[in-house]
Amino acid sequence: EVVFEGDRLEPEFEYVAGQWGTVWLREGSNANIKHLTIKNAIVGLLMQNSTLTLNDSQIYDCSNYGILARVSKIVGKNNVLNSAGQSCLAVSIGGDYQFTHCTFNNNWNSNKQKAVLITNYEKNEDETITASDLVRANFYNCIIYGSNNVELFLDAIESVAFNYLFENCLIKFNDFGTRIEKEVLYDFIRK
């Protein structure tokens, strides 16, 4: 096992998020990672147009994201992403993602974070939209859970593809009385 964590090893810092930056997989990177533990980062793994195979790994206590992937490709098996200030897994501007036997659990102490966030676009500060096809975001036998009523956030624009599948997954989703109560992207959960 390889462990990336903050350099403060006293017990009171064990669960403190944001002690160091990120593991950055830059454009064109192709990584194969097994048995990795990331703790206390700002962003555990930051990906921009890169490819990752991630197996038997853990990402805990990140102040922003466990994994933030833009226009990337991830195949993940048997991973745990837990506690992040914004999202354990955030994929934006499309890409290609497959997760099997993974747990995404977010018990952060606010009501704004999500365990999993999936979009096919991103809006820049000047309101410009960057979009790309979400070729696939498939989750097989995964757990998506946390401290909020809705732990899965889907958001798409129609001009590019938005393909997703959740098969045999446990998803915490109680949307009664929320702004997404009638959103068709979530119809697969309500059936």
Predicted segments with their positions:
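Beta-strand/loop edge motif enriched in small/polar residues
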Residues: 1-191
